[in-house]
Amino acid sequence: EAFLYGSASDNNIDPHIDSWPLGHEELVSVLTNASLIAGFKSDTPEKFVSDKNEQFQSVLGFHGMEFVLFREGQNRTVDAFKANETEEGMTSVKGIDELAFLAAVAGDVKNMTAMLEFTWMGNAASNDTKQVLQDNSYVFSSMRYNGFAAKGTMCYGQHLLTPAQTTGYQSWPGTINQIFVGGCSNICNEVQEQKLGQAWRVLNNQGGTTEDGEKESRDYIESPYSHRSFVDYKDNLYSIKNTLYGTRDVNATSPAANSIMSLLTSLNYPDLSKLQNALTAALKSLDDATAAQGYFLADPGSVAVKNAIDKIKDLDDELNAAGTWIG
């Protein structure tokens, strides 16, 4: 989630695979549409999703799959899939049709994540990824410049690492600032302001309006069916830690030698300890909230949630300060 700049945004991969909250009315429409169900059961269901997804964009990706797999924080049972759906408005939907939808959407996610890796890494992408895209080459047609940066002349990794006036970011400080602000701060702000903040504000009589002019909603909650919201939000923060530490080890206690934190150390960034402390406190705040109430949906308006909002906002402030200092 801290890497939503570049290919994920330019090629609309993130909204394609991670749209939420789930569009319930659209999901009802999809799962009761005989022609769409037939497409999900076709010989090439993932291609059907790729070609026809304008009819069900709000139910694609991880959260469409979540709806099929989980209810009330529990795995759905085999017996549940042998029967009809029990969700309001869907009681005519057969479990086997839901599984067809699940498999089709999962195949589409597989293709999109392969595309994300390939457009960042180019020929350095794994052989498995290259094979997925070779078998499903139609996905390139939906991408700008076949998915690549600088009008198709290079992969996004190369683009990020070659600052130049004509092809990449204009300077190294600009590149690092993009990582801090366009990457890390972007998801950090979303977690505290929207993923946690919107439901908390509404439940504490502080709800406002969204960018679209709609009233904020207490139901604006990610992963409500699996009850894994806090887990998801902590993973969002781990993506920030991975970015700063130069590692994929979320339990790392020190940054890699060639990492942004090590770079800040070498440059004698005066507020390095404030950044580190804010990261540690933000992660801990979600552990504390989990210990206090179990899962977000249990009490979205709680004191523990407000504490997490505040700590994650502190981290966002430190990320922007570091980005400004280096950029």
Task: Show which residues each predicted segment covers.
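Mature extracytoplasmic or organellar-lumen-exposed domains after removal of signal/transit peptides
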Residues: 2-327
